[in-house]
Structure formats: structure tokens, C-alpha cells
Regions:
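Acidic, metal-coordinating helix/loop segments flanking the phosphotransfer/catalytic sites
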Residues: 31-49
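Receiver (REC) domain active-site loop signature in two-component systems and cognate sites
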Residues: 56
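Two-component/phosphorelay signaling modules centered on CheY-like receiver
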Residues: 11-30
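His-Asp phosphorelay/catalytic-motif detector in bacterial-type signaling
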Residues: 46-48, 73-78
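C-terminal output helix
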Residues: 107-116
Length: 131
């Protein structure tokens, strides 16, 4: 079973992201309401993906991305940034910090589902016909 860490200071947004991703099937969701809580969870467990809000009250999304990329064990973790800051400058900044992908709020459920499917796909599997 794949594990996804959803990090957002809004419980409503955490629940909405999880609901959007339920069609993926066998996924276990864990939640963090702050950047610091996300770092603590990452230290204790392994995840296949992190969906991360950019703006949080303690440790921001960019700082969490930088922390993850500095850890050997976590370096390859795909990180999808989900934020209200959808401008090109914010996108470029988080991708340069090491985020894997970026999605601006508000988004359609199909948009986040497609992004997560792409990030969870094995390398080289995108566009391949199923065996």
C-alpha cells in the first residue's frame, strides 16, 4: 500500500485532497497541519509522495522542500506543491528549491489526481501500455 503525506494548515483542504485522491485505490493517507509536523512525520515514516501547501504558519513549504532534499533518505521523495500562489515567480521558486510539481488552488479533482498518478508512476511508465 502506498503512503501519501498531505500537509496543509487547513483541515478542510487536507480532507479535500484526500477525497480527490481516493480513486487511486490502495493508498494510506497521513496528515500534518504544519511544516514542522510534516518534518517530524517524515523522520518517523516512509512515504511515496508528499502533497504540500506552500504557506503555513510555522515552517513554510519551501523550507520543508529544502529539508527533504538535504536528507539522503528523503531526497527522491516526490513533492507536489499545492498553493494559492499560482504566479510564475512562485512556481519557479518552489521548483528551483526541489519540488517535483506545482498545482495552483483552486484546482479540479481531475487535475490533482493526474498529477499524483504521474508522480507515483514508476520511472518510464508514463505513456506505456499496461502489460
Amino acid at each position: 500500500m502506498k503512503r501519501i503525506l498531505i500537509v496543509d494548515d487547513s483541515k478542510l483542504m487536507r480532507d479535500m485532497v484526500a477525497a480527490c485522491l481516493r480513486p487511486l485505490g490502495a493508498i494510506a493517507f497521513e496528515f500534518a497541519g504544519t511544516g514542522l509536523e510534516a518534518i517530524e512525520r517524515l523522520a518517523l515514516a516512509s512515504f511515496e509522495l508528499m502533497v504540500l501547501d506552500l504557506n503555513m504558519p510555522d515552517v513554510g513549504g519551501v523550507e520543508v522542500v529544502e529539508f527533504v532534499r538535504a536528507q539522503d533518505r528523503l531526497r527522491a521523495l516526490p513533492i507536489l506543491i499545492v498553493t494559492t500562489r499560482g504566479d510564475d515567480e512562485s512556481r519557479a521558486h518552489v521548483l528551483a528549491a526541489g519540488a517535483s510539481s506545482f498545482l495552483a488552488k483552486p484546482f479540479a479533482p481531475a487535475e490533482i489526481l493526474e498529477q499524483v498518478r504521474r508522480l507515483l508512476a514508476p520511472a518510464g511508465a508514463i505513456g506505456r501500455a499496461p502489460a
